[in-house]
């Protein structure tokens, strides 16, 4: 009985196996065939760089036929640099010229002949979205400011220094008066660099030095000493950058009253950062410290291994500092990134570094914007402030100055990422022209993808509608807190950090909702 049962089970199993196997074999063959002869949707693509305008019809045909032979589905046409930047290659097709558009037209027709598709970037070069049609007013904007110390108690009629202006473009946002207790200039210090290398045959001059431009460099343990004639109260340390240098933000701060006995103040911690980190300096807040001697110790030991923070100073630790500035006024820890002036992620400011007494309350700050009248840089402030010393903070915005740097004939300022009109203007003057300057019928068949590549245009933290968008999205008015964008603490450390986080959230949302969303909408309408 058991033997018969086993035979029946075996027979049923064999029958089931023979029923399934052909399907499995057929499916396996199908997958293999699909891999060897993929559908158009599954075919790989490649980048097609047109370098320095060195492109010809013969070269276009050869390239595209090779792509077809290799089984590619298409290619992203991307011109890089112009004919003048690669003069040794004798390029003839400068971007935006009739010669260049003829090459684009020919490449589309050849791709159409071969059954290939094309994609193009949103601008000349590979980063990110700019061109010569973008004016400073239409470009990415940042908040800038200047400050002036005045005495209150009497009528003033003064002109204030204009903040930074890129290509003479600047617009005011607001003018504030903030009370200050001590308006004395920062004290001058004697600066000494000392080698701490233990290797006997290494001379100090070989390990730490200050060059003719004042840049301090070292590959070995060292310290930088600031010596003051009188005790100086330091609340923050501004590191002036000389290119990306992660090591400059790993200093251990020590202080002394006599130059012999030193006490620990703080170990500076670098912010998380991208490789494009040089638009702004980096300010580290410290507990208020009064001393005559400040030392900044550095050692390559303990450096974080190389990671997404693309800085060669992690792989080969070298200290490079253009300048250290010690300030007596309170500032939020690494406020430059928190204000959206540069992309960084830093530790929150601690209350022992910036206390409640160091933060301006809204009631202390006087808004003088309406009393500041005139045009451009000939505006005059007419006002009477209460007695005492006041800092006049003139805040405005200008272009960041970032361009699509890898471009050639189409190089220009990066468009305002918060303004749908400038995003459309960018699209209309580049990608849309690929249809207008060629055969539109062929272009619609071939040019099927719009490519938005590497974000290499720094940051943006303002435009004319930013305050309106902020209030709509966050539910409160940013304008009374505008000094926060200059690193000035307001209300409390917790409140300051929260508002700046809201600023960054608004920046992020506008980039997505305006820049990318608008490009997606108008891109779909074309391809």
Task: Locate the predicted segments by residue.
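Acidic/aromatic-lined carbohydrate-recognition and catalytic surfaces
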Residues: 80-193, 197, 330-337, 343-347, ...
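Carboxylate/His-rich catalytic cores and anion/metal-binding grooves
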Residues: 250, 447-482
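Mature N-terminal segment immediately following signal peptide/propeptide cleavage
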Residues: 28-74
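Aromatic, loop-rich ligand-recognition surfaces of beta-strand-rich domains
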Residues: 204-262, 280-355, 454
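The substrate-binding groove and active-site-proximal loops of carbohydrate-active enzymes
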Residues: 44-56, 86-102, 132, 238-240, ...
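Bacterial Sec-dependent N-terminal signal peptides
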Residues: 1-27
């Amino acid at each position: 009985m058991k033997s018969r049962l086993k035979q029946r089970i075996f027979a049923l199993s064999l029958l089931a196996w023979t029923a399934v196997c052909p399907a499995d074999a057929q499916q396996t063959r199908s997958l293999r065939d699909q891999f060897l002869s993929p559908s158009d949707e599954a075919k790989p693509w490649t980048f097609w760089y047109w370098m320095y305008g060195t492109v010809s019809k013969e070269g276009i045909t050869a390239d595209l036929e090779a792509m077809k032979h290799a089984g590619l589905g298409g290619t992203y046409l991307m011109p890089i640099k112009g004919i003048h930047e690669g003069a040794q290659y004798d390029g003839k097709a400068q971007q935006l010229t009739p010669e260049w558009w003829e090459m684009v037209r020919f490449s589309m027709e050849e791709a159409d002949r071969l059954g290939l598709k094309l994609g193009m970037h949103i601008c000349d070069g590979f980063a990110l979205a700019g061109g010569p049609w973008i004016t400073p007013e239409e470009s990415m904007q940042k908040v800038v400011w200047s400050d002036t110390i005045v005495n209150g108690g009497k009528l003033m009629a003064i002109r204030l220094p204009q903040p930074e202006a890129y290509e003479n473009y600047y617009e005011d946002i607001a003018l504030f008066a903030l009370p200050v207790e001590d308006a004395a200039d920062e004290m001058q210090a004697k600066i000494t660099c000392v080698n701490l290398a233990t290797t006997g045959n290494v001379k100090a001059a070989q390990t730490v030095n200050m060059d003719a431009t004042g840049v301090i460099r070292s590959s070995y343990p060292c310290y930088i000493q600031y010596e003051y004639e009188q005790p100086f109260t330091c609340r923050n340390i501004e590191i002036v950058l000389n290119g990306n240098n992660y090591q400059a933000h790993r200093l251990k701060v020590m202080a002394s009253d006599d130059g012999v006995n030193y006490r620990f103040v703080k170990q500076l911690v670098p912010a998380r950062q991208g490789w494009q980190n040089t638009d702004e300096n980096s300010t580290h807040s410290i507990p208020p410290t009064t001393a005559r001697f400040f030392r900044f110790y550095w050692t390559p030991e303990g450096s974080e291994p190389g990671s997404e923070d693309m800085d060669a100073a992690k792989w080969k630790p070298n200290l490079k500092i253009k300048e250290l500035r010690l300030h007596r006024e309170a500032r939020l820890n690494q406020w430059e990134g928190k204000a959206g002036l540069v992309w960084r992620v830093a530790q929150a400011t601690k209350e022992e570094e910036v206390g409640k007494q160091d933060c301006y309350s809204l009631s202390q700050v006087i808004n003088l914007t309406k009393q500041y009248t005139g045009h451009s840089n000939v505006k005059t402030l007419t006002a009477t402030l209460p007695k005492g010393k006041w800092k006049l903070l003139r805040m405005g915005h200008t272009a960041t100055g970032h361009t699509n740097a890898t471009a050639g004939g189409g190089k220009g300022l990066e468009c305002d990422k918060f303004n749908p009109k400038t995003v459309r203007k960018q699209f209309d003057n580049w990608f849309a022209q690929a249809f207008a300057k060629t055969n539109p019928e062929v272009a619609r068949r071939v040019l099927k993808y719009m490519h938005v590549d590497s974000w290499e245009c720094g940051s943006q933290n303002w435009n004319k509608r930013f305050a309106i968008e902020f209030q709509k999205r966050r539910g409160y008015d940013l304008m009374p807190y505008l000094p926060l964008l200059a690193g000035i603490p307001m209300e409390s450390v917790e409140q300051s950090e929260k508002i700046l986080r809201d600023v960054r959230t608004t920046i992020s949302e506008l980039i997505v909702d305006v820049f990318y969303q608008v490009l997606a909408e108008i891109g779909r309408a074309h391809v």
